[in-house]
Amino acid sequence: MKKIHPSAVIEEGAQLGDDVVVEAYAYVSKDAKIGNNVVIKQGARILSDTTIGDHSRVFSYAIVGDIPQDISYKEEQKSGVVIGKNATIREFATINSGTAKGDGFTRIGDNAFIMAYCHIAHDCLLGNNIILANNATLAGHVELGDFTVVGGLTPIHQFVKVGEGCMIAGASALSQDIVPFCLAEGNRASIRSLNLVGTRRRFDKDEVDRLSRAFKTLFRQGDLKENAKNLLENQESENVKKMCHFILETKRGIPVYRGKNNA
């Protein structure tokens, strides 16, 4: 059964699933689509054509789907935000709607954990199982692969791509693309090592060893793109292939490797 506080504003046309809770002074726009068992806490605002998946929670004063901070945006453009299942969006986080420069939607996958005061700008594409620590700031068109963790107080430049399974240390600043399964740190961020903690959580020892050998082959000496091409030959590991293809397809470049001895 839905629980809607009398002071909440639910515009006519909004679609609310089963057992949705909307607390005091929250606002849900007419084009919003809210899944089952979603909790929208006090003062949160769900705007524009925004979809929020089942079992998600939007905490107090978070704003999801407000217009993008883009001077070329025309308000008559159809835009919104799409968020998957089991999302947690903490206090004062802001997630802007997309623009015509993308497909009109900012997109976030399942199981996102977005901590307080984070900002996700227009047209960002975030995969599944993303964690953004407090005050992480994503500019427009940023892409984060599945299982990426971004530390607190970290800004990411527009159009940067961060590959699957990366760890970005807190108080870093990214202006270039980060290869899948890597740990990056610093201002400006450099690649420091394989993300051993993240890879060990997800893969068996043999696959972690393959990724570790691939990392050393790619980064320790020689030209990065030539190393990636050579490593792709007769490569059986799909995850190593992801690393190589990412390097060969980067648009913003890969930052300088400043490694740790145990990478």
From Swiss-Prot:
One of its GO terms (biological process) is lipid A biosynthetic process. PROSITE patterns: HEXAPEP_TRANSFERASES. It catalyses: a (3R)-hydroxyacyl-[ACP] + UDP-N-acetyl-alpha-D-glucosamine = a UDP-3-O-[(3R)-3-hydroxyacyl]-N-acetyl-alpha-D-glucosamine + holo-[ACP]. InterPro entries: Acetyltransf_C, Acetyltransf_C_sf, Hexapep, Hexapep_transf_CS, Lipid_A_LpxA, Trimer_LpxA-like_sf. Its EC number is 2.3.1.129. Its main location: cytoplasm. It holds the Pfam family Hexapep. It is an enzyme of class 2 (transferase). Keywords: Acyltransferase, Cytoplasm, Lipid A biosynthesis, Lipid biosynthesis, Lipid metabolism, Repeat, Transferase. It is found in: Cytoplasm. GO terms for molecular function: acyl-[acyl-carrier-protein]-UDP-N-acetylglucosamine O-acyltransferase activity. Homotrimer. This is Acyl-[acyl-carrier-protein]--UDP-N-acetylglucosamine O-acyltransferase. It comes from Campylobacter jejuni (strain RM1221).
